[in-house]
Design a protein with these regions (language model features):
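Short hydrophobic/aromatic-rich beta-strand segments that constitute the beta-sheet cores
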Residues: 54-55, 72, 106-109
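Ligand-binding loop in jelly-roll beta-barrel domains
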Residues: 92-116
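Short, conserved beta-strand element in jelly-roll/cupin
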Residues: 56-72
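A short, N-terminal "cap"/entry segment at the start of jelly-roll beta-barrel domains
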Residues: 1-39
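Conserved short histidine dyad/triad with adjacent acidic residue
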Residues: 28-32, 39-57, 84, 91-92
Length: 117
């Protein structure tokens, strides 16, 4: 039998800059499963006004917008301005562009290991 793991509060946690992008983007992995075959990582993402950020997913991810507003567009031309409570699924292989006029925050769960974003 496996016991649950309490990871503590993530409220107010600082997110490090995603320096590999020319955007005001910040991301941190809060928790990672111990399953080496099918890892799951949960964390936070913040984007502030400035350059947009384009990312190609090499894993499946769900992202819930928890604050602010982020425009999310894919390479098929679909574009949605997301606000608090909006949920997205990004399949592996999808190319997504994130932008905002002010700021937005998301909580994500991805099928990847720690630091593989």
């Amino acid at each position: 039998m496996s016991a649950m793991q309490f990871k503590g509060s993530i409220k107010g946690r600082e997110l490090p800059a995603m320096d590999e992008f020319d955007a005001n983007a910040f991301l941190d992995d809060f928790a990672v499963s111990e399953d080496p075959d099918k890892p799951i990582t949960a964390g936070g993402f913040r984007l502030e006004a400035g350059q947009s950020m384009t990312y190609t997913y090499t894993y499946h991810e769900m992202k819930l917008i928890i604050d602010g507003e982020i425009t999310i567009a894919d390479d098929t031309g679909q574009s949605i301005t997301a606000t608090k409570g909006d949920l997205f699924y990004f399949p592996s292989g999808s190319t997504i562009t994130f932008s905002t006029e002010d700021y937005g925050m998301g909580y994500f769960v991805g099928q990847r290991g720690v630091g593989e974003a």
